[in-house]
Amino acid sequence: MANHISSEKRIRQTNARRLHNRYYARTARNAVKAFRALTDRTEAEKKYPVLASMLDRLAGKNIIHKNKAANLKSKLARRINTLA
C-alpha cells in the first residue's frame, strides 16, 4: 500500500483515469459492433464519418492505439464497399 500522500493521490488519479478510458473504449467497441451489424449501405455511409472521428479522437488521447484506429477504419471502409 502507498506510504506517501502523493502516491495515494497518484493511485486515485490512475484509477479514475482508467475507468474513464475504459468507458470510452467500451463505447467505441459497441459503436463498431453496431456498425458491423448494419446492412444498408446508405446508413453505413452516414455513420462511418462519425465512427471514424470517434476512433481518431480516442487514438489522439491514447485510449486506443493509433494503428488500431487506422486498422478499424480501413476494415469498416472495406465493409461499406461490400454492402449492396
From Swiss-Prot:
InterPro entries: Ribosomal_bS20, Ribosomal_bS20_sf. One of its GO terms (cellular component) is cytosol. Keywords: Ribonucleoprotein, Ribosomal protein, RNA-binding, rRNA-binding. Pfam families: Ribosomal_S20p. SUPFAM superfamilies: Ribosomal protein S20. GO terms for molecular function: small ribosomal subunit rRNA binding; structural constituent of ribosome. The keyword Ribosomal protein applies. One of its GO terms (biological process) is translation. Belongs to the bacterial ribosomal protein bS20 family. Binds directly to 16S ribosomal RNA. PANTHER family: 30S RIBOSOMAL PROTEIN S20, SMALL RIBOSOMAL SUBUNIT PROTEIN BS20C. This is Small ribosomal subunit protein bS20. It comes from Porphyromonas gingivalis (strain ATCC BAA-308 / W83).
